[in-house]
């Protein structure tokens, strides 16, 4: 009987913690939405001011830092940039057929075959 009661208590605790977690997420979401969307400084496109170094206080819980949207967007396009820089998209200007060459050539280097 005690075991059953214990199991019920544990289940209730789990449920309570889950709902508290959900509530916390909701509150954080609402808090983040309340901030003003655009700051004047973020709209100056090509102005990079020197960043001040801030001393960070260590927090107990792991804090997920959100990157600025500009950096996130730049990172998003970076892989495309490298893709197009690679020789896969820019084969040699004189098209070299692999069968006419004395040495084997990688398929990647001339993708037109």
UniProtKB/Swiss-Prot annotation:
Other facts: Almost completely overlaps VHS3.
Cellular component annotations (GO), alphabetically ordered: membrane
Identification of the protein by name: Putative uncharacterized protein YOR053W
Topological category with respect to the lipid bilayer: Single-pass membrane protein
Localization terms from the record: Membrane
Keywords: Membrane, Transmembrane, Transmembrane helix
Transmembrane spans: 4-26
Taxonomic lineage: Eukaryota, Fungi, Dikarya, Ascomycota, Saccharomycotina
Superkingdom: Eukaryota
């Amino acid at each position: 009987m005690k075991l059953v009661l214990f199991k019920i208590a544990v289940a209730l605790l789990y449920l309570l913690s889950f709902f508290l977690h959900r509530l916390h997420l909701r509150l954080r979401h609402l808090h983040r939405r309340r901030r003003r969307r655009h700051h004047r400084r973020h709209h100056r496109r090509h102005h990079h001011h020197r960043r001040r170094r801030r001393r960070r206080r260590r927090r107990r819980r792991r804090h997920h830092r959100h990157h600025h949207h500009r950096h996130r967007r730049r990172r998003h396009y970076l892989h495309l940039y490298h893709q197009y820089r690679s020789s896969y998209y820019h084969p040699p200007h004189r098209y070299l057929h692999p069968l006419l060459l004395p040495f084997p050539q990688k398929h990647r280097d001339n993708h037109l075959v």
